[in-house]
Amino acid sequence: LYKDRQENAAVHQLFKVQHRAEDMEAELLAIVDNGGRVQTILIEHPVYGEIQTYLKLTCRRDVQHFLQQVASCAFRPLSELTDGVHYHLIQADSQQDLDYVEAALRDLGFLQE
């Protein structure tokens, strides 16, 4: 069957969040479990300005692999430079999925308005 290309277009939204380092797993799983894909993390550093890197986390397996990498090295999360405040660019298949992600982050107390 033919589907309109617009129907398959992904949507994106930038979410501002804040949490402790030990809440990283809960945050990332809330995103992927609600249909979101974590594209980037970005912080606003007072001296260096915006610092951004790609994460490309699309499922629980990606999140677990990322968390294992974090745990296996002397790594401090980027968000520690800004007291846990950071942004994620989230991609999803629909606006409804982004709304689910937003609600989950709000319910966890991570979403910053």
Language-model features: where?
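Minor-groove-contacting beta-hairpin "wing" of winged helix-turn-helix DNA-binding domains
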Residues: 1-5
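Mid-protein regulatory/catalytic core that forms ligand/cofactor-binding pockets
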Residues: 10-113
